[in-house]
């Protein structure tokens, strides 16, 4: 079974980008709360 690399990359980006964005927002919020 051949793996569709483009589909794999697209899925990885679709998962990682929102996760990274939320993680950055969380870190910024935590840093502000630690003040």
From Swiss-Prot:
Keywords on record? Chloroplast, Membrane, Photosynthesis, Photosystem II, Plastid, Reaction center, Thylakoid, Transmembrane, Transmembrane helix
In the bilayer, the protein is annotated as: Single-pass membrane protein
Record carries keyword Coiled coil = no
Provide the transmembrane region boundaries.
Answer: 5-25
Q: Which domain of life is it from?
A: Eukaryota
- Please give the GO cellular component terms listed in this UniProt entry: chloroplast thylakoid membrane; photosystem II
Compartment(s) where it occurs, according to its Swiss-Prot or TrEMBL record: Plastid, Chloroplast thylakoid membrane
Disulphide bridges: none
Q: Name one GO biological process term.
A: photosynthesis, light reaction
NCBIfam families reported in the protein's UniProt record: PS_II_psbM
Per its database record, what is this protein's job?
A: One of the components of the core complex of photosystem II (PSII). PSII is a light-driven water:plastoquinone oxidoreductase that uses light energy to abstract electrons from H(2)O, generating O(2) and a proton gradient subsequently used for ATP formation. It consists of a core antenna complex that captures photons, and an electron transfer chain that converts photonic excitation into a charge separation. This subunit is found at the monomer-monomer interface.
The protein's name in its UniProt record: Photosystem II reaction center protein M
Tell me the organism.
Adiantum capillus-veneris (Maidenhair fern)
* Gene name linked to the record: psbM
């Amino acid at each position: 079974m051949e793996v569709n690399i483009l589909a794999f990359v697209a899925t990885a980006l679709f998962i990682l980008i929102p996760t990274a964005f939320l993680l950055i927002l969380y870190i910024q919020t935590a840093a502000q709360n630690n003040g």
